[in-house]
Amino acid sequence: AGCAIGAVAPEITGRDTLGNPIKLSDFRGKYVIVDFWDSYCHWCREETPWLRKALEAFKGKNFTILGVSDDRKKELWLAAIKEDHSNWDHLLLPPKTDIFTTYCIKGIPHLILVGPDGKILAKEMRHEELTDVPAKFIK
């Protein structure tokens, strides 16, 4: 399945905050925390400061974050990104995309680490794990 550690992360496609096409494979060659979240998910938005810490910790080390949301209201999605200062790439899924089944997600927030080769290195990370776990791989 596409959710096992060591499996190649299934492709995720959508639109970025400017409406341009964006996909997970655009980030091949980098370590990527994929953050599955929604604007109305309080717990998801509580991860934002931890994600900012990770971005700072691995600055210049081939690392990035991709926020993935299935928000139905684009304006709420954009407002949450701005409000939370989530200054990384974001992808809004097309309606009715069943990414939750593809990635075996039982609930959000759901955060995984994908390696430069596109394989899943870790999953279900929270809080300080967002820095501690990538540190095991990023030298």
Name these PLM-found stretches:
Residues H85-S86, L93-I138:
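Thiol/disulfide oxidoreductase modules built on the thioredoxin-like
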